[in-house]
Amino acid sequence: MELWPCLAAALLLLLLLVQLSRAAEFYAKVALYCALCFTVSAVASLVCLLRHGGRTVENMSIIGWFVRSFKYFYGLRFEVRDPRRLQEARPCVIVSNHQSILDMMGLMEVLPERCVQIAKRELLFLGPVGLIMYLGGVFFINRQRSSTAMTVMADLGERMVRENLKVWIYPEGTRNDNGDLLPFKKGAFYLAVQAQVPIVPVVYSSFSSFYNTKKKFFTSGTVTVQVLEAIPTSGLTAADVPALVDTCHRAMRTTFLHISKTPQENGATAGSGVQPAQ
């Protein structure tokens, strides 16, 4: 029996299911996203190795170029407000809210030069995805061993200043799509105080109008990205961290609730001062 007619029939059946079922469309789009991540990771890893020969933060520009194309598959648009606040040539800790697997697209839309991320160690073993993260200079934390994680963070604090690095961290510690922010973990703030570098909060509006895992829908939409003013840490000590966490959380939560109330569907009008990401 010919293979191609079977594949064509399966594809037609899948397309029919997608048209008839919102849940089928959701799962098909998520599957495509995962396939894109693995495929692009493999291709980008090869490009990074050919271009830079190994692990370096410079590979992030290559990774970003690939990932920024994902939004065209899904009809997503990112409206970035005050992006210049991320572009200053200085080390800093960038903190942002963490909603879903789609966060990587939002991150790459505004990722500044010489910026690395912190990720859980399990991702290192995720095939080509782990490889491209390693090549991009991502720092992996073993959450099960707090002493090891603290050692990595201490080393990172020194490297930030020495190598003029920006570090991107999700202080909620886990994905959260409940329409609000979770309490922040303190690691990012201890890191900023240790290195005496500013904290730059980045807030993404809620994805819930176009992406919802509970209701199983995944449509096109617009994400508002607000970069807040940097919070200085010069002269602060570990004793100041709880107040620093509270200040940052309140500012980000207020912004999140505000920008998530604006229309997020296609055709929505952006507010003043909005700069579309290219």
Curated annotation (Swiss-Prot):
DNA repair among the record's keywords? no
Which reactions appear under catalytic activity for this entry? a 1-acyl-sn-glycero-3-phosphate + an acyl-CoA = a 1,2-diacyl-sn-glycero-3-phosphate + CoA; 1-(9Z-octadecenoyl)-sn-glycero-3-phosphate + (9Z)-octadecenoyl-CoA = 1,2-di-(9Z-octadecenoyl)-sn-glycero-3-phosphate + CoA; 1-(9Z-octadecenoyl)-sn-glycero-3-phosphate + hexadecanoyl-CoA = 1-(9Z)-octadecenoyl-2-hexadecanoyl-sn-glycero-3-phosphate + CoA; heptadecanoyl-CoA + 1-(9Z-octadecenoyl)-sn-glycero-3-phosphate = 1-(9Z)-octadecenoyl-2-heptadecanoyl-sn-glycero-3-phosphate + CoA
Q: Where in the cell is it found?
A: Endoplasmic reticulum membrane
How does this chain sit within the bilayer? Multi-pass membrane protein
Alphabetized SUPFAM superfamilies for the sequence: Glycerol-3-phosphate (1)-acyltransferase (SSF69593)
From its record, what is one biological process in GO terms?
Answer: triglyceride biosynthetic process
Q: Which GO terms describe its molecular function?
A: 1-acylglycerol-3-phosphate O-acyltransferase activity
Q: What is known of its domains?
A: The HXXXXD motif is essential for acyltransferase activity and may constitute the binding site for the phosphate moiety of the glycerol-3-phosphate.
Alphabetized PANTHER family for the sequence: 1-ACYL-SN-GLYCEROL-3-PHOSPHATE ACYLTRANSFERASE, 1-ACYL-SN-GLYCEROL-3-PHOSPHATE ACYLTRANSFERASE BETA
Under which name does UniProt file this protein? 1-acyl-sn-glycerol-3-phosphate acyltransferase beta
| Organism, scientific name | Homo sapiens (Human)
Phylogenetic placement of the source organism: Eukaryota, Metazoa, Chordata, Craniata, Vertebrata
Q: Which gene encodes it?
A: AGPAT2
